[in-house]
């Protein structure tokens, strides 16, 4: 049985780890390289490193921070932010990323996903989906894709888009609920489940973890293969070990360190 992965997320702005609420109100959470070392030592299964202003400010990811983070950390590292070309993917992989997250560029050109997957293998291409619920209370649930760090609406249906990019070669989908991001009120389980049911690739649940039960729900109710969290780890509410123990006690298959 495949083990559920716990993935701390480092959102980086101007070389510092930050944590926001619904993509805004960013507060400082430390040095990315030191954070990476701490999570590596704590037994995190993977680390997600997102340069959250790269697409918005139209510049590349901070490669020196990426390479120093990769150097300090032995768990798989997913890096995203400002990835626009096959050359960008290659540069990040050479800098030490194991997987590369594509967001805005995948929306603008889904064929880019196919091109990158063909060149480097679908196992290292992660499409990051930032979605917001746009349906009313009495309508069938519907979510819209946003790009540029959640700033730009696209009119695209999130579930349809997920299906399309997974067919084009995305090896994994990182699904973030913008409504839930930073609120600590739990994942948008309906969104996670709708996408997990629509695709054949692993889905990472993201946005809204407030406690350890939320991680369990992401897998059990949301159908996620991995759970991503930031606030509960960055600010010392829980450790990765506590999260793993809690999820294992709930009957989920986890990689437990000796």
Curated annotation (Swiss-Prot):
The keyword Protein transport does not apply. Keywords: Amino-acid biosynthesis, Cytoplasm, Histidine biosynthesis, Lyase. The active site is at 11, 130. It holds the Pfam family His_biosynth. Pathway: Amino-acid biosynthesis; L-histidine biosynthesis; L-histidine from 5-phospho-alpha-D-ribose 1-diphosphate: step 5/9. Its main location: cytoplasm. The keyword 4Fe-4S does not apply. It catalyses: 5-[(5-phospho-1-deoxy-D-ribulos-1-ylimino)methylamino]-1-(5-phospho-beta-D-ribosyl)imidazole-4-carboxamide + L-glutamine = D-erythro-1-(imidazol-4-yl)glycerol 3-phosphate + 5-amino-1-(5-phospho-beta-D-ribosyl)imidazole-4-carboxamide + L-glutamate + H(+). PANTHER family: IMIDAZOLE GLYCEROL PHOSPHATE SYNTHASE HISHF, IMIDAZOLE GLYCEROL PHOSPHATE SYNTHASE SUBUNIT HISF/H IGP SYNTHASE SUBUNIT HISF/H. Heterodimer of HisH and HisF. This is Imidazole glycerol phosphate synthase subunit HisF.
């Amino acid at each position: 049985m495949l083990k559920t992965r716990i993935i701390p997320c480092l959102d980086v702005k101007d070389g510092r780890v930050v944590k926001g609420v619904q993509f805004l109100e960013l507060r400082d959470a430390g040095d990315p390289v030191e954070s990476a070392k701490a999570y590596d030592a704590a037994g995190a299964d993977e680390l997600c490193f997102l340069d959250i202003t790269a697409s918005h400010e139209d510049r590349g990811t901070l490669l020196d921070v990426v390479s120093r983070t990769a150097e300090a950390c032995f768990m798989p590292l997913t890096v995203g932010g400002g990835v626009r070309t096959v050359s960008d993917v290659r540069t990040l992989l050479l800098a030490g990323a194991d997987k590369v997250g594509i967001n805005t560029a995948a929306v603008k050109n889904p064929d880019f996903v196919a091109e990158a997957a063909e060149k480097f293998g679908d196992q290292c291409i992660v499409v990051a989906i930032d979605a917001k619920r746009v349906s009313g209370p009495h309508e069938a649930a519907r979510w819209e894709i946003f790009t540029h760090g959640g700033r730009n609406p696209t009119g695209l249906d999130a579930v349809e888009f997920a299906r399309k990019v997974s067919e084009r070669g995305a090896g994994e989908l990182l699904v973030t609920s913008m409504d839930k991001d930073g609120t600590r009120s739990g994942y948008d389980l309906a969104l996670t489940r709708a996408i997990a049911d629509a695709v054949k690739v692993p889905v990472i649940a993201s946005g809204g973890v407030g406690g350890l039960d939320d991680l369990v729900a992401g897998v059990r109710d949301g159908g996620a293969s991995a759970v991503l969290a930031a606030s509960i780890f960055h600010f010392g509410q829980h450790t990765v070990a506590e999260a793993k123990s809690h999820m294992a006690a709930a009957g989920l298959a986890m990689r437990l360190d000796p």
